[in-house]
Design a protein with these regions (language model features):
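Surface-exposed recognition segments
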Residues: 85-165
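Short aromatic-cysteine micro-motif
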Residues: 1-79
């Protein structure tokens, strides 16, 4: 369940997100937990990003307070799992010397994965960003991994996190 009317934090590294969750006696969700929590959230392809979920960048637009898009809620009651901000999850992917290809609907220990591109490091383990942001439009889908092998010290206006118990 998410809290409504919270302004999400941005420009957060994976390490800062992990520390913030720990300070709240919580933790970052695993990729599999995130995948279960997103079920039932509208796909950004269902509208132009202005009514369902905050997925369409418009000049002057920022991430919206949680729950401000009434229809952007998952079956589990989590707000804004698609759009608003990309979210760090606990899982890292192993070292990779190249990033290429597409994964879709593949069952793995870390959940169903779909690679859509994103900033990547080469040759180092990387953290995962899930869900897309208001900056990504239709790429902000429920199965999107918008960063594969992203350095965990990366920050961005469209990067945030959520905590789990």
């Amino acid at each position: 369940m998410s809290l409504a009317s919270v302004t999400p934090s941005t420009l957060i590294t994976w390490f800062q997100a992990q520390a913030a969750c720990s300070n709240a006696r919580k933790r970052l969700p695993t990729n599999a937990e995130w995948q279960a929590a997103v079920a039932g959230t509208p796909d950004p392809g269902s509208d132009d990003g202005t009514t369902d979920c905050n997925t369409t960048f418009q000049s002057g637009q920022d991430p919206t307070p949680t729950g401000s898009r009434a229809s952007c809620v998952s079956a589990q009651g989590a707000f804004d799992m698609v759009g608003n901000l990309q979210e760090w999850v606990a899982d890292w992917l192993p070292r990779s010397d190249s990033v290429s290809g597409t994964w879709s609907a593949g069952v793995s220990p870390t959940g169903d994965l779909q690679y859509l591109g994103g900033a990547a490091t080469t040759g180092e383990p990387g953290a995962l960003l899930r869900g897309g942001s208001f900056l990504l439009g239709a790429l902000a889908g429920p199965l999107a991994i918008n960063g594969y092998n992203v350095t965990p010290s990366a920050v961005g206006f469209g990067i945030g996190f959520r905590c789990a118990r």
